[in-house]
Amino acid sequence: MKFKFKFGEFFLGLATLLAIVLSIVLWIFIMTSDQRFSNIGQNQNNTTKQQARSHSAKSLYDLYIPTTSYGFVDGRLCQLYDSKNNLTLEFTKEIQKAKAVSDVKKIVKSRAKYEEYLNDDAYLQLVYPDEITFSLFNHLNNSNNDNREFNRFFVSHSNNIIYLGNDQTSAIYRIKIKGANFDKLRKFARNAKAKSPVHLVKLQEGYSPFYSRTTNSKVYSYLTNHQSYSYFISRLLGTSGVTSKTNKSGQTIYSFNYYTRLKVPDPESGEHNYLYTHFEKNKIPNATNRLLDSVYYVHQLGLTEQDLRFFDADGSNVGYVNYIEGIPVFLNQHDLQVKTTFSYDSINVAFNSVNFQIPIPFDGQTQELKPTAEVVSELGAHGLKQSDIQRIIVGFKIEKDSSHHSLINLIPTYYVKAYDEWKSVDEWEKKNVAAYRKLRETVKTNEVK
């Protein structure tokens, strides 16, 4: 028996080694052929804030890509996904070519009419996770100062008209365009490999997809790495004139003059969270410039950006996460990859240095996900009412794999945004929701005073 155990151990180790080698080969193949990676090596390291605000940074379109696609299958609304024929990338490629030939015209302003569009099988829907402004893509708008917001594209059978919807205000706008051809997008939608039945439910921040049945979602694995803290010091502060000071918790703060600093994690902690701060007295930028300026700071970090996407914008905050197989990845249970915060006296950029480097071939492991309505009902029993929920989505939670120090597993789970905080369902069920509610009521009372 002892001999057999060692023999089995040998083959297990050999299989793991072969899987890693195969992953490296696949990674090289993907890097040289997959459209997602076609722009690697063209990082916008030299992008200035002025270039970002003038919309001249090419990867503006790489970061601001719709992240979810919907279409109808046999009269039923489905979330569509195909890793090979990526609908959102195909849409973005065509919308970049589009040019507005008319002014933006509001055609819908009631919730009832808005929901008619949501449930109309004549449209494909390409959706951002949060609102962006009309002026972000100025070729679709004849005004550079239009801070009206939208989060949803409706693509009809025509290539000459595009509709933009705002889930929160129930407004739909029509723009006549030229230069785009969505025929391939429609073909991708018809033939999408993943078609998950959903219905859209209005929550605080818009319509979230509620999955109608229990699903077994794939667990993915990746080899990860992290840039050294010296890499970020060099990029963000420079190589000369930098001073440092270590606090009691082991964190070191590096400073360049009085205006710029970088807080790095304790090397022994295993943490990879950084905080970059630039002090400057200024007005908080308007909505469009917050989105554009955050692109500038993302580029300054020097993170790998091929799967990094705009994810959340609340007031003065703009956040980005990595999307893998169409699903957002949360770090440290519920953190975003990058979060920029604008204030009157500083700009803060909190970020994590993780890089999802090499995908491991799928081994068949899955995670069961309940129907969304059932999850919301369970949260209600723990005190988090549906009326408290701003958004609910399926996201990836990271778990370390014991077989290799750099190997992680991405576990599908429900994430909920409530009281302006993202947490997994498991986390919310352990929280004192009454305390959150009381704090919110206190803040509202003070605002009235």
Locations of regions flagged by a protein language model:
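N-terminal Lys/Arg-rich, disordered targeting/topogenic segments
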Residues: 1-8
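Short helix-loop boundary/capping segments
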Residues: 345-369
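Hydrophobic membrane-insertion alpha-helices, especially the h-region
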Residues: 9-30
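Short, non-transmembrane alpha-helical segments in secretory-pathway proteins
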Residues: 279-316, 362-403
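Preferential activation on post-signal-peptide N-terminal prodomains/segments
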Residues: 4, 25-286
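Amphipathic, soluble alpha/beta structural segments
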Residues: 140-163, 378-413
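Extended hydrophobic
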Residues: 361-365, 395-448
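Exposed beta-strand-loop-beta-strand "reactive/processing" segments of non-cytosolic proteins
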Residues: 231-275, 304-347, 352-354, 393-422
